[in-house]
Amino acid sequence: MTTVQLQKTNQPSIKASRGSYWITTFGCQMNKADSERMSGILEYMGYYPAEEELKADLVLYNTCTIRDSAEQKVYSYLGRQAIRKRSLPNLKIVVAGCLAQQEGESLLRRVPEIDLLMGPQHCNRLESLLNQVDSGQQVLATEEQFILEDITTPRRDSSICGWVNIIYGCNERCTYCVVPSVRGKEQSRTPEAIKSEVEDLAKSGYKEITLLGQNIDAYGRDFQSQNKEDSAQVTLSYLLKYIHDIEGIERIRFATSHPRYFTKELIDTCSELPKVCEHFHIPFQSGSNKILKNMGRGYTIESYKNIINYIKAKIPKAAISGDAIVAFPGESETDYEQTLSLIDEIKFDHVNTAAYSPRPNTPAATWPRQLNEDIKVKRLREINSLVENIAKERNQRYKNTSQEILIENINPKDSFQLMGRTRTNRLTFFPRSLKNGVENKLGELIKVKITDVRPFSLTAKLL
């Protein structure tokens, strides 16, 4: 969960002040990017960032429904705002994102104080929806929509690294996942629109971009179904080449990939383009072919390993991360051990792990052989221990080496340190100090020497 509390823009709003706003974001990078865009819309409308959540005139929760724990947090936050609204009737409460799409009218019945409830496909319509609220309506916007190309400038949380959505929605039907039902069908943005946004970021001084999509390597395939001219050529590989030479952008990343669409052509392209960073996040979810089939993932462990082996052959220094779910319905001890074996064999730099959480309206939630909480806790603890040990082992290769770091921020826990990431996405901390009488600035690319390693971060000194 992240909170968007941004500095006030230097550019005056086009419209008169309408009060303060606060956005709290739950969940994935797509939600973070959506929140930045909604912040831009609110400031265009005349809102300004609040200093505190409980003092805001408009509160927006951009929600996640991938796990039950995320939902419960939202309900807790909404309860607090509902109490506020009873004494502050002009307070506006907005719920956006995947939980809003999933629950719809039932959420309005549960929390009638909500003024606007809208799914992810409606983020770019925030202004018109709030205008309906201002006319006295309680607004529900969850119908499937074509996502408008928004010309409003996002109010970005960083002035160095920018998110760029390139494909919305998901056409997969994983049996545990609600994303297709809440984010809709795949919809790729045109290469021209994406390039224009990246060029604007470069002009504003951004050094790194991360291209985003639920299944980013499926980019462009919906163009083919629409019979657009030259649509077969529009792929993620094509897009990377198309935007690569934009002046000012030093690094390009992308997430999240689906193994089914991760091609040798894409790997070859990444190896040829110097701005594309050597980090690949490719979720595997399980090391058992039986479980992968039950999950509806559409690939085997053997095909997944082929992808990883090809990456390692073409880009030997690449870092590889993934996602894993343990305690999926029917997962035997053997299935679970196969997941541990896969992690140990591939030696992932990092794995995001989770115990299976039944989600409403998904096939797996109704299946027999649901595993109990004790097994979930045990397996999650064990896999996390393995992931941490391997991550520290993998990080040893950086010790005493020189690495390029993009300075992103001051360490929030130590104001005497700066922080940034290597090209392989290793978070790195190093001291603030003068070089030729001048302190390094945020947004600079510098060389450091790695002096110490931890499982999920590095410590360095300036060269």
Curated annotation (Swiss-Prot):
An example Gene Ontology CC term for this record: cytoplasm
Binding annotation for [4Fe-4S] cluster 2: 170, 174, 177
Catalyzed chemical reaction(s): N(6)-dimethylallyladenosine(37) in tRNA + (sulfur carrier)-SH + AH2 + 2 S-adenosyl-L-methionine = 2-methylsulfanyl-N(6)-dimethylallyladenosine(37) in tRNA + (sulfur carrier)-H + 5'-deoxyadenosine + L-methionine + A + S-adenosyl-L-homocysteine + 2 H(+)
GO biological process: tRNA methylthiolation
Domain of life: Bacteria
Record: residues binding [4Fe-4S] cluster 1: 28, 64, 98
Entry keyword set: 4Fe-4S, Cytoplasm, Iron, Iron-sulfur, Metal-binding, S-adenosyl-L-methionine, Transferase, tRNA processing
MF terms (GO), sorted A to Z: 4 iron, 4 sulfur cluster binding; metal ion binding; methylthiotransferase activity
Cellular compartments annotated: Cytoplasm
Co-factor binding comment: Binds 2 [4Fe-4S] clusters. One cluster is coordinated with 3 cysteines and an exchangeable S-adenosyl-L-methionine.
InterPro entries: Elp3/MiaA/NifB-like_rSAM, Methylthiotransferase, Methylthiotransferase_CS, Methylthiotransferase_N, Methylthiotransferase_N_sf, MiaB_methiolase, rSAM, rSAM_horseshoe
Start and end residues of each MTTase N-terminal domain: 19-135
Pfam name, any one: Radical_SAM
CDD domains in alphabetical order: Radical_SAM
Function: Catalyzes the methylthiolation of N6-(dimethylallyl)adenosine (i(6)A), leading to the formation of 2-methylthio-N6-(dimethylallyl)adenosine (ms(2)i(6)A) at position 37 in tRNAs that read codons beginning with uridine.
Subunit structure as annotated in this protein's UniProt entry: Monomer.
Name of the protein described by the UniProt record: tRNA-2-methylthio-N(6)-dimethylallyladenosine synthase
Originating organism: Prochlorococcus marinus (strain NATL2A)
Taxon lineage: Bacteria, Bacillati, Cyanobacteriota, Cyanophyceae, Synechococcales
